[in-house]
Amino acid sequence: MATTTQRRLEPTSIRKFGTGLGQFDLPDLTALQTVSYAAFLQEDAASNARKDHGLESVLREIFPIASYDGNTTLEYLYYELGKPRYTIQECRQLRLTYGRPLRIWLRLNREEPIEEEVYLGDLPIMLGGGEFIINGAERVVVSQLHRSPGVDFVLEQDTTTDRKLPSCRVIPERGSWIEVNVTKKDALTVRIDQSGKFAATMLLRAMDPKYSTDADLLSAFYETGTIKVNGGKDATKIENKIAVDDVVYPSGHERAGEIIVEAGYKITTELSETICNAGVTSVEAMDLPKVPLIFNTLADDNTASHEEALLRIYQRLRPGNPPQLEKARTLFQEKFYDDNRYRLGKVGRFRLNRKLGLGVEETVMTLRPDDMIAAIRYLIDLFDADSGAEIDDIDHLGNRRLRTIDELASEELRKGFLKLRRTVQERMSVKDAQDMTPRSLINPKSVSAAIDFFFGRGELSQVVDQTNPLSQLAHERRLSALGPGGLNRKRAGFEVRDVHISHYGRICPIETPEGTNIGLISSLAIYAGVDDYGFLCTPFRKVIDGKISDETVWLRADEEGESYVAPADTEVKDGALVPGPNMIARFRSDFEIVMPEQVSFMDVAPAQMVGVSAGLIPFLEHDDANRALMGSNMQRQAVPLLVTEPPIVGTGMEREVAKNSAMVVRARRAGKVTYADATRIEIGSDHYPLKKYQGLNERTCQNQKPLITVGDKVEKGQIIADGAATQKGELALGRNVLVGFMSFDGFNYEDAIIISEELVRNDTYTSIHIEDFDVEIRETKLGREEFTRDIPNVSEKALRNLDDTGIVQTGTYVKPGDILVGKVSPKSKTELTPEEKLLHAIFGRAGEDVKNDSLEVPSGIEGIVIDTQKFSRRMSLGEDERKAFERELKQHETEGNEEIASTFESLIRDMEEASGVKLKDSTGTPLADGQDPKFVAERATSFRLELVLEQIEDEEKRKAAEKVHQTQWQNVEQAIDERDRKLNSMKRGDELRSGVLQMVKIYIATKRTISVGDKMAGRHGNKGVIAKILPIEDMPFLPDGTPIQIMLNPLGVPSRMNVGQILETHLGWAGAKLGFQALTPIFDGASESEINDCLAEAGLPAHGKIRLTDGRTGEPMEQETTVGYIYMLKLHHLVDDKVHARSTGPYSLITQQPLGGKARFGGQRFGEMEVWALEAYGAAYILQELLTVKSDDVEGRTKIYESMVKGENTLEAGTPASFDVLTNEIRGLALNMQLEKRPI
């Protein structure tokens, strides 16, 4: 019989398939989060060298704050971030936020300026690849994909005429939207936000006095000129022209000053003769335009000046207010020219310039009148179909951009600082000038509340999916179109959800949820990056005259639009593209056969178009897209197993995913391993504590194991310890199992899976899950609660696992109902039952005043207690407790000093080695002389580098010593901070929630072996539920006697069109036989002929089929079966978490029916359709029982319980409580409904 060691596959070599074109180095997969948050904080930059970005930008925008009278101003100088008060572990255990204090330096300008530091709250610290610890839980802020600020031109269907009319929207980063539409009467109208429509020329008049008159507006859009006329003979010169300005009778004429032709009107033959005969010498005119939009708009515009236009727009925006010119001017100024209220933003200005061909500086953030003129000109060109103007595709990634955490956090903090500004101005007006200080003016709660809301409760702040390393990495790279300022899933249409050609290399076309969020939640492609404007870009190799250059360029979607892009697997010879019928290139959304000279760019890798999860699916190109979507989503649900194993058939991405995941440990610096065990690793002066059996967000288990031994040399960034679901630094989500695609007595009907008992016996798919429970002690009105072993009315047997303080002992195996922590609460005197009163009268008053409030193991949980932790506030201590506390404090101080002394002496020795000088302090005592640790720690605290460098005369050696100090001093600082933090923490006690005096946390490890009902899946979307576990002897076996481990239904392949699983099976079989791991990158992997060659080399049939023998009968199977090794995952949908049965439990107060759901220990709903089923069978008594005594007949429940106790089989059904609710509802409608009971 096969044993674990025989069936565990250990490949001895690696075979890489494909052309090897995907050698382009992968970028840092977590950069989307880490780089943007670093840009937001700018913590490494000097306070006076910070860019106007992120937090710095918000502070510069809000400050200075001036008082209402202008006499006092509060100026911002700089900000600094302190050190965190708590460790990561403390924050997890005590449900705190892991952050660092934000302090800003402010100057209050009055008669005597005051500079002061003000604390504004804690800013969360980013861990790993983008997680924050907020209130004890790890969260991530998902990046938002939204419609970019700028100008968009679209065609909209007119419902009455069926014409497609162009419209334009000017969308700012902050402020009012302006929408310009072409009406069915061929005029231009404008809407500001949701205001009523008015003529577009009215807005232009209001924006700038230089566009006050019709002549000014016509001159802005068309070529105009002055035509000289002299008598009637020149009448033809101005005939059929358009008058740009009013033509009036000249002075000296009997009708002097009267208008002959108004501006914007056509000069007819009759009018031209009148003008010439009247003695007019010159006419401002223009040719009749092809598109009459402006003329039609001027005809609709009943304003004639700048002031009149302002008043009309004011009436539209404030319909109820009386029109006043100054108020109208102020409103218009605030709406479009005030930086605080209207801001196009850097991106908006960039897009305006790009679309309209403007060359305006990007620092100009407001909308200029010339911008609106240019936008309307473009709209006129769109109306003229022959002009070549193009409408915008709003789903194109050139028009959608990414808002990363720096922008999202800045926006939320800005709201908090605006509240702060109002508060400061109010306080300035009521406080006496002499008593004012920055601290007395600032209320930090408005800022800290904004920080707490954004990171803790914001729509884009989500609890990290930590099922396995891939799920965490994928969550950090997720893009959402939902959230504040984004789309609504109910109103989002098909177009915005669909895959777009501009997604190529930027957004994964495969990875997206299957439900209502499909297409709205997406994932970043492997090589994609974000540029300074927030647009997604992807790398390409530059091709010049058919030759591939070494230059790599990162292009936005709009930059790529007009170029031919060759795929990565294009045939190349001597660095040049090979012409021929196979020379294809992508141009926009089409592939064309082209000449090499036409190609401008080339993909950097075949896997460029997909995301991380899809990049892990071997033979992805042979799978249907729907199944690939399921495969990439289900890999994120794979549970980390007890014994990990990388896939025999991989894509080469497995190592990259593990390396970029926060679950493994990577070396911060190169060096030599000085210490390594299961709990910590030391490389020189760097210390790496390892996490042991730590529960993650999804209750999966993180247990880090070292990969190196003492004496090994490691490089910077090398993986030195494995985490959950990794092996030797490679992602290992499942196990390689021997599969047979065959039906088996119908047990694998409808995708059900049959597995061998061998997988259960050998713990192949066993996983560990960590559950944590906590219980708190509070001060109640009746007295204080207490942890104790002395619990009333509880047997000694139930207390056997508790220690003297009432806490369960580590290592105890617990089951549902077992006591984890003994706790008693004060009990009100009125709560005593008559029986208790009698007992207290007989046995005295002991135990009378407390009730049992212990923490018990809930149903469905069974396992071993792996850790218990007790936290308490530092309260008044007794004499013995105080002495014990002082001893512990002294011990921690000694340990801290020893750690500081060790790191400091290591630094000094390395500096002495680099300089060749014995370094001394100011008294002449050697710095590293192995003295008392306390003395050395004090010396380290007061250490000054310049005093030491003065002792080194040689310039080069001084620089070498300084370099050693730069690399190692932070370890000394870290040791000092750790000692001080630990001592301060002990002195002040644990930071528990308000009202909590003590808290105990219990961690239970549950071992889950694979069982019937568990969900399993491959990487190709081939999922199923285990229907049967067969004994090993009943499983079909190969000719050499090896039993099959898992049987899948062959009908699951053709209709699902995921043939990749069959290719994986064949190559996996060859790999297992020959002892190699196959790396077959997507779109550039092993071909069919290469797989056949591998099978032949292994001595296996070329078609991958073999005749199996039935283990039950010993007879050979009738047909040959496809057999091989496939990588199968156990998913997080475990049957143990879902199976639930109710005996007695809570009832709904109103209907008196049992509650629903496992969490509430609810019942199974017997619904309408189930009632029909019993009615169809005529099972009247069963139905009566289900709808009354088993549900909400309160009296009937009591009676049937009594009859069961007496052993009688009687059923007396009464009226269901829900029926009483119905009758009361009807009576509430003033209908007198009465029940009449008749004997049956």
From Swiss-Prot:
The keyword Transcription applies. Its EC number is 2.7.7.6. Pfam families: RNA_pol_Rpb2_1, RNA_pol_Rpb2_2, RNA_pol_Rpb2_3, RNA_pol_Rpb2_45, RNA_pol_Rpb2_6, RNA_pol_Rpb2_7. This is DNA-directed RNA polymerase subunit beta. NCBIfam families: PRK00405.1, rpoB. PANTHER family: DNA-DIRECTED RNA POLYMERASE I SUBUNIT 2 (PTHR20856). It catalyses: RNA(n) + a ribonucleoside 5'-triphosphate = RNA(n+1) + diphosphate. One of its GO terms (molecular function) is ribonucleoside binding. It comes from the Bacteria. HAMAP family: RNApol_bact_RpoB. Keywords: DNA-directed RNA polymerase, Nucleotidyltransferase, Transcription, Transferase. It is an enzyme of class 2 (transferase). The RNAP catalytic core consists of 2 alpha, 1 beta, 1 beta' and 1 omega subunit. When a sigma factor is associated with the core the holoenzyme is formed, which can initiate transcription. GO terms for cellular component: DNA-directed RNA polymerase complex. GO terms for biological process: DNA-templated transcription.
